[in-house]
């Protein structure tokens, strides 16, 4: 049956009037913050090879894209993700550019999703930032600092919750239990959906003792501030997960020193579904949004798909989720205006991360443009 042309395809939207103005204002405000941290805007192709997204997002996520074949018989997809394309650009187009690279974007992404609720969408606009070519805590703190400044600029800091975790904790446990890829994914789904009963049942086939089975199930439900890390260490014995806990504790100490712990939590059950994350992950929630409004993490292996492996960390915000929330609150966001080319260079090598980012945030509060120099 052919749908009448007076309708639009399911999951698509028109925007006009106050809603369109709000969307433009929110986007401008977010991009102004990225500019203030010296991120360069990049636009990636709307149509790309399906294989690009299979490598970046994983097969299952990539195959939720709108797929089609071009005249040469090549399988293409409407872009379901931006990070994979930015990583390729870093490894190819910008291979000779001095590191680190900082990119930001405001781009629509498309997914074939099942209808689940009234606000179901198959097109979303993603606004994100990528910091490529820097390992270590300072780069991760920069990413979190930018995200929190954006939420503050949108008057959402008081109502936001950012959960941090490391995929290496989960990976170490999976390795300890000798899970294959399918079993690992099944356990990830059970952890992500907080299905405690099914998780314990699943673990009964792999845990060596009843105590281990119950302990691992409890571990995956641990969330809170830094004190939960001690509880996790009483359960975990494998070196890979213990090393990840040490790294998470190091990050958390800086989060506390920067007074960001009020809007951050550690959540060992917040397990990402994207294949490209390699260490830190975080998800962004705002009270009243009904779903997470963003997330990100470290993806050190992704650029290696294109011949240049290097560390990278980034995050994305969902413009639709943010503006839906702000519309319900009756918010209006005026244009943020353009940034300035003047820039204050801050040297990461000479300063502890907490002190470095205290200085950076103080300058950003005065609307200065800052650039963290990781090269010394």
Predicted regions and their residues:
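Acidic, His- and aromatic-enriched active-site or binding-groove loops in soluble protein domains
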Residues: 64-71, 178-201
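Positively charged, Gly/Ser-enriched RNA/tRNA-binding surfaces
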Residues: 2, 19-37, 49, 83-96, ...
